[in-house]
Amino acid sequence: SASYTAENAQPYQYDGDLINDFFEKRYSLNKNTLSIIHLWGQHVNAELRYPHTAKFNHFTADSVKVKHQWLTKEMRKKIAHYDNATYYNDACMGKILNHYRNANAVIVYLSDHGEEIYDWRPSMGRKIDPMGKNVVKYQFDIPFVVWCSDKYKAKHPEIVKAIRAAVNKPMSSDI
């Protein structure tokens, strides 16, 4: 299990290490650069996706508030791991945003898929049987964020306006 880029010479256990390496090697970017950073995010197995430090061991099985009768302590632990991986992913995204905050930059963030983590049935991962509204909600609805730096907003107000106008339009990440 490793994160990778065309730039790095070693695998990384955690996304934050990949991001640090990327910024160290690519700090001076050319004027027009497209960088794609593919993160592990909260991918199964979520307990492997974040450093188990005091900062990121934020959620526990006891902090899971879901009340399904079939939810076991072990399932609650898996939900907590997923929540901790999400918390860590937020920190990683914050690191990326802060890096480009003063640049003329646009960042697009999206997931390749969702994960079902005991949301409505005793199931974890991506199982599309039976296909229905809950499967679509938990496995196919994904975050899609477009962030523009202040410098970009000032230089390209027409593009920013078009982005804002598209906020509630449907989109698909399938290509």
Regions of interest found by a model, annotated:
Residues S1-I175:
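Catalytic domains that recognize anionic headgroups
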